[in-house]
């Protein structure tokens, strides 16, 4: 993890696409280390969902950087000129789609149904789908995905999706 961060700081953050994947892998590393440190088994589902969600958010954030660069000429990142909005919209759409499908597969997997003793977990997919679509709207229409934390704290629709997901 430390070597990956050093490589990222020195060179990899300058490489388009690689930079975003490194960020997502970093979240997976933290998840694995946390699981190991606490003695909690980390399922392949949580690893996959963590990676995909981090990738989705990182691409959305990069898109915000691109829009800022195109509007002001200010580079938030060195590699911002290696991306464009059309490419980012495609990448975000692909990752969002894969994330949703993966989550639905998770909710209907035998392992998860048995673990939670419920055949109705798939209902939570409604809130995941709505939340991701709303985040796409915030990213593409509102152009306000520069800070995922700020979106989470301020967007009532996304907050309601999270509450609905937790309740179901």
PLM ranges: what are they?
Residues 1-8:
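Internal transmembrane alpha-helices of multipass membrane proteins
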Residues 10-15, 21, 28-168:
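C-terminal membrane-associated helical module and adjoining short loops/tails
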């Amino acid at each position: 993890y430390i070597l990956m961060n050093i490589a990222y700081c020195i060179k990899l953050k300058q490489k388009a696409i690689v930079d975003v994947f490194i960020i997502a892998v970093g979240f997976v590393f933290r998840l694995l280390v946390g699981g190991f440190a606490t003695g909690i088994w980390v399922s392949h589902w949580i690893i996959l969902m963590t990676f995909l969600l981090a990738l989705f958010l990182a691409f959305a954030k990069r898109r915000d950087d691109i829009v800022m660069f195109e509007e002001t000429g200010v580079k938030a990142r060195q590699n911002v000129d290696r991306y464009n909005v059309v490419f980012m919209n495609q990448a975000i759409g692909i990752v969002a789609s894969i994330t949703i499908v993966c989550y639905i597969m998770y909710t209907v997997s035998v392992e998860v149904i048995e673990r939670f003793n419920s055949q109705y977990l798939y209902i939570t997919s409604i809130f995941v789908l709505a939340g991701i679509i709303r985040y796409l709207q915030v990213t593409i229409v509102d152009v306000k995905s520069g800070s995922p934390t700020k979106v989470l704290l301020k967007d009532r629709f996304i907050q309601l999706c999270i509450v609905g997901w937790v309740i179901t």
